[in-house]
Amino acid sequence: LQLFSAEALAVEQGQTNMFFPNDSDETPGCHFAPTPNLNVTRSIDFIESATLFMKFLAPSLPHATVPGGADSIARGRATFGTVGCAACHTPTLRSRAETDFPVLANKAVNLYSDLALHNMGPGLADDIAQGLATGDEFRTAPLWGVGTRAFFLHDGRTNNLIEAIRAHRSAGNGTYGPSEANAVIANYDALPVAQQQDLINFLRSL
């Protein structure tokens, strides 16, 4: 989380720090504003404060009956597993036993992610390579709180959950291979419409 905080400051806010001391050259994609830039370097104390803030944020609580009713949500939860979504969007992980904060040790975390990188194919690729991740590799997005979001996928390209699900399907091209999720999306598309809606209701309840 500390590195995440530091990188977000550097990349999203343009604020260098001890972990990321150099500005990124964003010239090719920028529209320059006439106002001058501020030279801001954030201290380790600021980064630690941001890290602690995120570490102790309470998770969003799922709805038991909204939308669609409890029975629909329960059916959707079961379908989420049977079609294969849960293979990557793992419902529950456990926090580490060793931590500076015992209150956070060995806790069930219902984030719906395996926190792993997966090849998603050219359809979702942003061509941004970072570390060992290629331009079509993405960490599985946690789904807790997805019911409160207005836009979906890494670039917010859609406000429709069904479109977001189907965007996981992508054939390979000369640059990237096919999406790892193709079989799962085929399973989803094969569901009766009522079961598809149950799955959407379950996601909206998170």
Model-found features: residue ranges?
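Periplasmic c-type cytochrome electron-transfer domains
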Residues: 1-206
